[in-house]
Amino acid sequence: MKVNVKKLRDTAILPEQGSAFAAGYDLFADVAEALEIEPHKTAMIPTGLAMEIPEGYFGGIFARSGLASKEGLRPANCVGVVDADYRGEVKVALHNDGEVVRTILPGQKVAQLVVVPFLSVEFDEVETLSDTVRGVGGFGSTGK
């Protein structure tokens, strides 16, 4: 599958796959200079890219495992969604969960993009739902 990508600035870096079987494509910070993220704060990190995700798909913006586990940096909304009809700049709302200031450098990998198919659904309002063994059991109801 091809995804059309427009560089909004010459300094932008196209998404890159870290290995042959990686589902995620690295997104890079397109910042002119180092950007600091204070503890427990969020910064919008530009990528310098706009995309044309094919109809029937969306781009999921996920944390990079190393940034999350070693630096305490993750997307503020846990998973960002780039819809197929969005044509603006892709940005990463990066949150610092740590207790120290973190620095984002120009060209640094800040998140990963996974292009995912989805189904369009129609919601029908009903009076009752079918019974199941689980029923209304919620959080933790299926055991550890």
Model-predicted regions and their roles:
Residues 1-144:
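DUTPase catalytic domain/fold
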